[in-house]
Curated annotation (Swiss-Prot):
Belongs to the thiolase-like superfamily. Chalcone/stilbene synthases family. Pathway: Secondary metabolite biosynthesis; flavonoid biosynthesis. Pfam families: Chal_sti_synt_C (PF02797), Chal_sti_synt_N (PF00195). It catalyses: (E)-4-coumaroyl-CoA + 3 malonyl-CoA + 3 H(+) = 2',4,4',6'-tetrahydroxychalcone + 3 CO2 + 4 CoA. Keywords: Acyltransferase, Flavonoid biosynthesis, Transferase. This is Chalcone synthase.
Length: 393
């Protein structure tokens, strides 16, 4: 008879969870930020609101976003006038879109990650799916399992409605799954479509307008496993530790509520100030055990909630300009894609690091940090260890 302790020991993996592949996808419809205010006020029949339009123009100019991708095309919006209104009952129309499109976009990203990984999809043992767009039963995790043709015994975890910090959350959960189950391979997918939050402008709800200037659609997928077989798998980053915390005095700073009118977005406090004031505490807790206190010695992946958050974090921590280069690049090219952003940045960083011959997947540095920020205010902190770049080819 085998003891429980022996079974438990055999179940555990040896090494740390490792990122083995990354894939990303966006809808085909690309929206340029310079053209967006005119388009947005026209499509929502709000051109008479000239002062508000000027305000929105300034928001778009300050956003540091060049372009975004959106499932919602002009044709779709013309067919769904209630989605264009500021507050009209429209949840059914929105749900009908996202329940189908979220798993589809997730499948595109996942297929790219699986292709890069190079292993049969039958080796995927766990699926973690995350979206803030739409809720359904069975969920987007089930739909993706069907779309990809994963085995029916894949162990699924569905995270709905978490918000912008959740790119960190999925890595934390995948790390625990991979390290606790020897031989497991976890497919992680974040798929976000703004059809749930899109709405017309109102001068009574400027924080909603901020969201209209920032949010974009995108999906990202990563494959995570401990003890990679380096003959057939190429490690990209190791996940060394992960933490989650609620910031003090931040209740109500970011809220989202699912209503008949869709998902409403509220920004109630000085979010950049709250994050920048508290971020060093998370860094100290994460890196003191490793013996690191120079934040410029790390490579950085931070959720780009908006440019003000990045500016204030940079200022508060005395970060060199190049530290947030990958983060700012993704914000500029895609906008704020909620949970998917940090995975896009991870992808951008390893690609650029290899292109530029940096010597490691983390811009030539050994240690890095990944931050998710979102409703709560919740902060996710993931400590990353890079892999020497030749191994990542």
């Amino acid at each position: 008879m085998v003891s429980v302790a022996e079974i438990r020991k055999a179940q555990r993996a040896e090494g740390p969870a490792t990122v083995l592949a990354i894939g990303t996808a966006t809808p085909a419809n690309c929206v340029y930020q310079a053209d967006y205010p005119d388009y947005y006020f026209r499509i929502t029949n709000s051109e008479h609101m000239t002062e508000l339009k000027e305000k929105f123009k300034r928001m778009c100019e300050k956003s540091m976003i060049n372009k975004r991708y959106m499932h919602l095309t002009e044709e779709i919006l013309k067919e769904n006038p209630n989605v264009c209104a500021y507050m009209a009952p429209s949840l059914d129309a929105r749900q009908d879109m996202v329940v189908v499109e979220v798993p589809k976009l997730g499948k595109e990203a996942a297929a790219k990650a699986i292709k890069e990984w190079g292993q049969p999809k039958s080796k995927i043992t766990h699926l973690v799916f995350c979206t803030t767009s739409g809720v359904d039963m069975p969920g987007a995790d089930y739909q993706l399992t069907k779309l990809l043709g994963l085995k029916p015994s894949v162990k699924r975890l569905m995270m709905y409605q978490q918000g912008c910090f959740a790119g960190g959350t999925v890595l934390r959960l995948a790390k625990d799954l991979a390290e606790n189950n020897a031989g497991s391979r976890v497919l992680v997918v974040c798929s976000e479509i703004t059809a749930v939050t899109f709405r017309g402008p109102s001068d009574t709800h400027l924080d909603s307008l901020v969201g209209q200037a920032l949010f974009g659609d995108g999906a990202a997928a990563v494959i995570i496993g401990a003890d990679p077989d380096t003959k057939i798998e190429l490690p990209l980053f190791e996940l060394v530790s992960a933490a989650q915390t609620i910031l003090p005095d931040s209740e109500g700073a970011i809220d989202g509520h699912l209503r008949e009118v869709g998902l409403t977005f509220h920004l109630l406090k000085d979010v950049p100030g709250l994050i920048s004031k508290n971020i060093e505490k998370s860094l100290v807790e994460a890196f003191t055990p490793i013996g690191i206190s120079d934040w410029n010695s790390l490579f950085w992946i931070a959720h780009p909630g908006g440019p003000a958050i990045l500016d204030q974090v940079e200022l508060k921590l005395g970060l060199k300009e190049e530290k947030l280069r990958a983060t700012r690049h993704v914000l500029s090219e895609y906008g704020n894609m909620s949970s998917a952003c940090v995975l896009f940045i991870l992808d951008e960083m390893r690609k650029k690091s290899i292109e530029e011959g940096k010597g490691s997947t983390g811009e030539g540095l050994e240690w890095g940090v990944l931050f998710g920020f979102g409703p709560g205010l919740t902060v996710e902190t993931v400590v990353l260890h890079s892999v020497s770049a030749p191994a990542a080819h």
